[in-house]
Amino acid sequence: MGLMQISLFSVFFLLSLNVKAQNKSKENFNFPKDRKTNIAVLVYDGVEIVDTGGPMDVFIKANNWNGNYNIYTVSASADKNTLMDGGTFNMLSKYSINDAPQADILIIPGTSPEIVHKVSSDKKMMNWIVKQNEKTVMTMSVCTGGLILANTGLLDGRSATTHHWSLDELRSHPKIKVQETTRFVVDGKFLTGAGVTSGIDVALQAVEIIHGKEVADDLALGMVYDRYNTMEFLPKK
């Protein structure tokens, strides 16, 4: 075999290894192939509007890029009514935590710190999160939804983030590796967003994991969203 042939063989071999490395994370996310992927967004009184709508809109639009998503909200209230942030409007969910199907992707939006403490004391809702997480392919949080997720104990031993005003509270969980100045963190099947609009970043990252970077970038372009923005605007400590 000549030097040129050896060189080309080496290049193709290295490229094949690189492809496997890029696909390795995808192989860990076993989404259903015989039905739509269930995406459940948990809502409760006082839930933040952009936290809720941002990720939902990403997955709704991803259906135009060969996505196969069944997106729905799940209310913590038995009557399926949820009073959104600021008392601006009522959302009537398709399901409540009493009758919701098993989610493949579970999204937990955030709210004010006061309401975080209130909903975290709702044992039925917190147990529902834990039970759903047993079979989710991905579990995501947005903003202070990371605190709700942390209060279940599911983030223990994981890297995670939350809204920059609530990082100290996240640090009160000593088993969580708190990440600062980042818009989102991916650790295993857990994706945590920093705050409000970062829910869009988290959802786009999920799309990238599932469909590839090109699809996620095209989707962001269609949404007129810069998915490569930074946290440089935060006040320096």
Residue positions per predicted region:
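Small/polar loops that bind or transfer phosphate-bearing groups
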Residues: V43, T162, A194
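Bacterial Sec-dependent N-terminal signal peptides
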Residues: M1-K24
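Short acidic alpha-helix initiation/capping motifs at coil-to-helix transition points
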Residues: G195-G199
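Conserved Rossmann-fold dehydrogenase catalytic segment
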Residues: Q179-A194, V224-Y225
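Extended, subdomain-level signal for the structured scaffold at the beginning of enzyme domains
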Residues: A21-T139, L147-N151, D168, V178-E180, ...
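A short beta-strand/loop micro-motif in the catalytic core of glycosyltransferases
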Residues: T139-M140, A160
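A conserved active-site-flanking secondary-structure segment within enzyme catalytic domains
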Residues: L155-T182
